[in-house]
A protein has these predicted regions:
Chain B
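Bacterial N-terminal signal peptides that target proteins for export
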Residues: 1-9
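Flexible loop/hinge segments at secondary-structure junctions
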Residues: 23-141
């Protein structure tokens, strides 16, 4: 069983005790009379993963506590129509991804002209579907693990934020509801210990060393139609990523040789969410095409349906089913797909303390790509247990 | 007969028009900080505030939503279209993605009224029988 390092456990425990009875706090303008109020919020999550077969998201066949997240943010409104906000973040998924490095999750200045138009610049969360910009916020959903074919916990460093900016706003459509938009562009910053780097290393032969991961340029738009039916919204997202890839050093008999791989990516995603009474009903479809300079391409996709019901203030539960295909031309090969049926139980023990337990039955090994070589064939299915607790203020 | 039908129709129209003019929230009234210029809001405008589509008052003061958990859930659902749990999750998503600020909360009606009175740009739904000291009532149309 893999445990986090002990210094971190002590630090996190002290933080938990301090946060346990805390509410979000604010530096009042009466303390610093010329300063607008600054709001602080944060969260701390610790999870446990255990799988019956195959190590997935860590050394999980022996049980793994290397599944943690912590965020701390501050925001203020220094001028009319203006907001400044920033969040520091640390996480770990397994022994190779994240490693509790603390990074700048987002930091932006935002100016809202009116309801129809605003601009946000800096390091901004990338809008994509229901969960991309909040996939590491355990509080914001019923489940422990989001559908991994679409929201891979190991790849957050690549997918969650861009350095650039976005325009946003909402247009009323009279009796047809309203249309919200976010259009963004910027540069991604894959971390040296992030999921993308780990995946690329796992794909390289023994004589090839990964030197760097490219910081690709990305641009896209997310639209949400807030329909006239209260609680129902329908979304669509399109994005283009240019210059993804890596730099490598290849050890040859005549000495080291530099290598490089680049490719472009098209992504689109459709989403439907319906909040009806105590139900939260969601479904999404995701499609990605990676194209190399030679013209070769790989198309992958994923979809899920989910339902969650809040029984009372402290208990919510719900199942989801998801499928992922690494290569849409190989839908029959369990090496290239991963199908997952999950049931999640969420307990809101306090307004600041959430506990979740979740079971998965998984068929296929299409997402084990970076943890095991060669990827094993699965024709019978396997189980995974996920447990997580989160404190917030 | 025709004139009676016409009179009944006109009466229904008047009653319907009267209902449209003022929307009563279930067990709650909307209050705001005295510095807020608006004296009334449409139901759509109120929903836009509670669903983060409108973030600033005219003049640029940021809107600060304050809530009283458990006591005004029905009125909150009328205003936002979400139950209390969905509302909390909605704003947590915004707060932890850099797109908004979580609503402030108070433990009782008096504390909520005091919070709104002392916070520029604040708006809240309080129980209908709460004492509204230092705040202004917002009519919902």
């Amino acid at each position: 069983m893999k445990y986090p390092n002990h210094k971190l456990i002590l630090t996190l425990t002290a933080t938990i005790l301090a946060v346990g009875s805390a509410k979000a706090f604010e530096l009042s303008s009466t303390t610093y009379s010329n300063l607008p109020p600054i709001d602080f919020h944060g969260y701390l999550s610790q999870g446990f993963l255990d799988s019956s077969s195959y190590n997935y998201l860590g050394d999980t066949t022996r049980g793994s506590f290397l599944f943690s997240e912590a965020g701390f943010n501050a925001s203020m409104n220094p001028f009319p129509n203006t907001r400044i906000t920033a969040q520091a973040f640390s996480y770990d998924v397994g022994q190779d991804v994240g490693k509790y490095d603390v990074g700048l999750d987002y930091a932006s200045i935002e100016y809202t002209v009116n309801d129809y138009f605003g601009v946000r610049a800096g390091r901004v969360r990338r809008p994509e579907g229901i969960y991309n910009d909040i996939q590491d916020v355990d509080l914001a959903r019923t489940s422990v693990l989001l559908p991994q074919g679409m929201y891979d916990a190991r790849w957050r460093d690549f997918y969650e934020s861009v350095d650039g900016g976005e325009f946003f706003g909402t247009f009323p459509l009279s009796k047809a509801g309203s249309l919200s938009y976010e259009t963004f562009a910027g540069v991604a910053n894959p971390a040296p210990d992030g999921g993308l780097a780990t995946y690329l290393r796992s794909q390289l032969p023994a004589n090839v060393q990964l030197d760097a991961v490219n910081s690709p340029v990305e641009g896209g738009v997310q639209l949400w139609w807030n329909t006239p039916l209260n609680g129902l919204r329908i979304g669509g997202m399109g994005e283009y990523i240019s210059g993804a890839g890596d730099l490598t050093t290849v050890q040859t008999p005549v000495g080291p040789k530099n290598g490089a791989t680049t490719y472009s990516v098209w992504v689109y995603q459709t989403s439907v969410e319906y909040l009806w009474k105590s139900w939260t009903l969601q479904t999404e479809y995701y499609n990605k095409t990676r194209t190399y300079p030679t013209g070769a391409y790989i198309n992958s996709d994923s979809w899920y349906v989910s339902a969650a019901y809040r029984f009372n203030k402290w208990f919510e539960a719900g199942p989801y089913y998801t499928e992922y295909y690494a290569d849409t031309t190989q839908r029959g090969n369990s090496l290239d797909y991963q199908k997952d049926a999950a049931l999640s139980l969420r307990f809101d023990l306090k307004s600041w303390w959430v506990f979740k337990v979740e079971g998965h039955f998984i068929h296929g090994t299409g997402l084990l790509e970076d943890s095991i070589q060669p990827t094993p064939q699965d024709d019978r299915g396997w189980f995974m247990l996920a447990v997580k607790t989160t404190f917030s203020f | 007969m025709k004139s009676t039908t016409l009179k009944l129709g006109l009466l229904c129209a008047v009653l319907a028009g009267g209902a449209i003019r003022a929307l009563a929230l279930d067990g709650g009234v909307v209050i705001a900080n005295p510095g807020v210029a608006a004296d009334s809001l449409t139901a759509d405008a109120l929903k836009n505030i509670y669903t983060a589509k409108t973030k600033y008052w005219d003049g640029g003061q940021n809107i600060v939503i304050a809530v009283l958990p458990d006591k005004t859930d029905a009125a909150l659902q009328q205003a936002s279209g979400m139950d209390a749990s969905q509302f909390k999750t909605f704003w947590q998503r915004l707060a932890f993605s850099g797109r908004g600020q979580e609503p402030k909360s108070a433990d009782d009606a008096a504390a909520l009224v005091a919070l709104v009175a002392s916070t520029k740009g604040a708006i809240a739904i309080v129980p209908a029988d709460a004492a509204l000291t230092g705040v202004k009532k917002i009519d919902i149309k």
